[in-house]
Structure formats: C-alpha cells, structure tokens
C-alpha cells in the first residue's frame, strides 16, 4: 500500500488500517498486527480503538484475547477498503 503512504504519509493508524485491509478476510490479533507492521502492541492497541469505536473495525472476544477485522457490514469500512484497493491499481 505504498500509494497511500505517498499521499497521506506514514502514520501508525494508517499502517494498522492497511494491515487490516490486506487481511480483511481473516480475523487477527493485536500481537499479529504488531508483528507484521513492526509497531508495538501498545501502539496498535491505542490506534485501533478509534477504528473500533467508529465501526470500521469489528472487535470480537476469543477466550482471553480479542480478534479484529474490517467490518464488511459498515459502509465507511467498505468505502475505505475500496479506495485503498483502487488507489493501489493506479500510478501515483
């Protein structure tokens, strides 16, 4: 998702969002996002909260842990996902 970085800059929230979009069909954990992005668990936890609060990301308990994934039932999440996928298909 280098095109998004060129346009919006690299922020922790964009990095987490990009990771969730790349793995939108699979629920993931804070630790998995942290490992794949190079961010700390605490940073991922901090920046994912507004995405969950806004309904863009769904949080589900799984035992003592929580899983996260893009909310395919949320219009904003679908628009963001479509935009991200589309922007990567053009030259920027």
Please state what every model-predicted region is.
Residues 1-15:
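Short alpha-helical segments that sit at the start of domains
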Residues 21-26:
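Short helix-capping/hinge SLiMs at alpha-helix to coil transitions
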Residues 32-35:
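A short acidic, leucine-rich amphipathic alpha-helix
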Residues 42:
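Key DNA-contact positions within bacterial/archaeal DNA-binding proteins
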Residues 48-49:
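Short, hydrophobic-biased segments on the C-terminal half of alpha helices
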Residues 52-62:
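A short, conserved structural fragment
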Residues 61-67, 73-74:
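Short, Lys/Arg-rich nucleic-acid/phosphate-binding segment
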Residues 75-92:
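Amphipathic alpha-helical dimerization/coiled-coil segments
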């Amino acid at each position: 998702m280098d095109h998004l970085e060129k346009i919006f800059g690299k922020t922790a929230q964009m990095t987490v969002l990009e990771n969730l979009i790349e793995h939108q069909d699979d629920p993931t954990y804070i630790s998995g996002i942290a490992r794949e992005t190079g961010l700390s668990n605490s940073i991922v936890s901090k920046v994912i909260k507004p995405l969950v609060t806004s309904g863009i990301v769904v949080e589900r308990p799984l035992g003592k842990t929580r899983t996260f994934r893009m909310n395919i039932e949320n219009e904003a999440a679908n628009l963001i996902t479509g935009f991200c996928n589309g922007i990567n298909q053009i030259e920027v």
